[in-house]
């Protein structure tokens, strides 16, 4: 298994993984995005934050990415994380591996807090976040409606940086000097 950064050309492979979830409550999207739209997401998010792929023999098994958690300027040092694993690759620790690399990259970029937003019930995602040191921040009750029922969403939080002093601007992932070394270490 090899971890690398995604590029817009990976949209079809990532979309194939995501398609397995579109009819579930794991995502609140109800219509599968087009390949062009997904490519745009990879390009847009990847301009600032990491979007990672776990692949084996050239096949995408899973992906994880981060994006800005809130719009207002003062929230700029937070990131929301997501991970999607191909169903036939579940149970291999891919989510843990991708999140671990994602968190290391985000910390070097200057992100101070990482968030996971999980529709309940989702035992696998809850276990992943707790295993990696996230704590439950709170529950948005009945915040989404999909597949004939109202759904709760739990927010997980993990501080990954210092909260002393004025923060420096985030380093966009393409400009992060440590990025190659972090990926190399993940692939040894």
Predicted segments, located by residue:
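Conserved acetyl-CoA-binding loop-helix of GNAT-fold acetyltransferases
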Residues: 91-104, 127-131
């Amino acid at each position: 298994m090899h971890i690398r950064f995604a590029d817009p050309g990976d949209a079809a492979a990532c979309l194939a993984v995501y398609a397995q979830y579109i009819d579930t409550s794991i995502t609140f999207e109800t219509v599968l995005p087009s390949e062009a739209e997904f490519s745009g997401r990879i390009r847009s998010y990847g301009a600032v934050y990491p979007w990672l792929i776990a692949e084996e023999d050239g096949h995408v098994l899973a992906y994880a990415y981060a994006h800005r958690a809130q719009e207002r300027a003062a929230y700029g040092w937070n990131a929301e994380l997501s991970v999607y694993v191909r169903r036939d690759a579940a149970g291999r620790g891919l989510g843990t591996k991708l999140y671990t690399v994602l968190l290391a990259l985000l910390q070097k970029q200057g992100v101070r807090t990482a968030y996971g937003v999980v529709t309940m019930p989702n035992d696998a995602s809850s276990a992943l976040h707790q295993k990696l040191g996230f704590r439950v921040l709170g529950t948005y009750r009945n915040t989404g409606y999909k597949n004939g029922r109202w759904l709760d969403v739990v927010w997980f939080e993990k501080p990954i940086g210092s909260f002393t002093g004025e923060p420096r601007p985030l380093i966009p992932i393409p400009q992060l000097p440590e990025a190659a070394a972090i990926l190399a270490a993940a692939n040894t």
